[in-house]
């Protein structure tokens, strides 16, 4: 096995068990509700249903990124003992955490000139798409690849990962400035579920306005067929995540599993975590898979 440490952040929205099994240490973001600060701890201290119920009832969570000091504290034990670290961050298109991570990595390099080095990669991803990229990275690492080889694989393939999502509740997107008040009012009145993606710069980008949830479910499956490697013969991994809308995500998963029978296992469904969920609110369904390279 390669002799370096692969690390990430809690915004990757995979389970605690996944990170433990794949030997990927995780540093956590934070969120705040009613002046109380909580840790985005992979739902160890709150359930997804309770968290999204708070938002549905009017709670307005605020989020904060991992600080430079927290990164230093997280990596220092590895660096001090001479272990190199490869760290993937949440997309720089939606968070400033990449910059903080780079600052912390340089500070540790200055403090431990003979110690391990930290290499930081901007994933350009979020939620379980970020988590899927980590899974592929762990596979490459476990094949015996060096840190540089693993980093090169990530950089070469990260834009082949697709991230598509829709939401039936636009209130959190309005509050976060991702859509205008007029769009939110019209969208709610017309039952529009916007189909969105993460673009090649790692930013949220609207792609299509779809009337009704039923059509959005169907269009999400069609979108995968338009971009996935090999079409119906795709044999790679597909992951989905959702924010308190299990029935909707299972409906999309059922369509995809019917249309792509060669999938690597059944579609894994995860809960959107508290960090990302603070911005989506309830009602978001997200889909992640390997496809053609994103160019816009």
Protein language model regions, located:
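A short, structure-level motif marking secondary-structure boundaries and short turns
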Residues: 1, 36-37, 59-60, 122, ...
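N-terminal glycine-rich anion-binding loop in soluble enzyme alpha/beta folds
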Residues: 5-70
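A short glycine/small-residue-enriched secondary-structure motif
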Residues: 45-52, 75, 80, 107
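Short beta-strand->loop
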Residues: 89-91, 121-124
């Amino acid at each position: 096995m390669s002799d370096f440490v692969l690390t990430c952040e809690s915004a990757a929205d995979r389970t605690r068990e996944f990170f433990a099994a794949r030997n990927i240490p995780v540093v956590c973001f934070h969120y705040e509700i009613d002046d109380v600060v909580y840790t985005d701890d992979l739902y160890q201290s709150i359930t997804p249903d309770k968290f999204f119920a708070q938002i549905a009832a009017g709670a307005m969570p605020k989020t904060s990124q991992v600080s430079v000091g927290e990164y230093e504290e997280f990596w220092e034990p590895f660096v001090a003992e001479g272990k190199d670290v490869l760290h993937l961050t949440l997309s720089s298109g939606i968070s400033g955490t990449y910059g903080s991570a780079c600052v912390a990595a340089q500070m540790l390099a200055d403090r431990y000139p003979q110690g391990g080095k930290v290499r930081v990669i901007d994933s350009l991803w979020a939620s379980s798409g970020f988590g899927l990229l980590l899974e592929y990275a762990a596979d490459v690492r476990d094949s015996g690849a060096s840190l540089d080889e693993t980093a090169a694989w990530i950089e070469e393939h990260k834009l082949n990962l697709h991230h598509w999502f829709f939401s039936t509740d636009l209130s959190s997107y309005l509050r976060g400035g991702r859509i205008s008040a007029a769009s939110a009012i019209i969208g709610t009145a017309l039952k529009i579920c916007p189909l969105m993606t993460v673009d090649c710069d790692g930013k949220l980008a609207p792609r299509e306005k779809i009337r009704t949830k039923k059509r959005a479910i169907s269009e999400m499956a069609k979108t995968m067929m338009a971009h996935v490697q090999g079409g119906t013969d795709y044999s790679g991994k597909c992951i989905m995540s959702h924010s308190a809308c299990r029935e909707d995500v299972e409906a999309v998963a059922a369509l995809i599993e019917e249309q792509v029978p060669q999938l690597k296992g059944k579609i894994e469904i995860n809960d959107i975590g508290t960090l990302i969920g603070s911005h989506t609110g309830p009602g978001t369904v997200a889909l992640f898979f390997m496809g053609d390279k994103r160019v816009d």
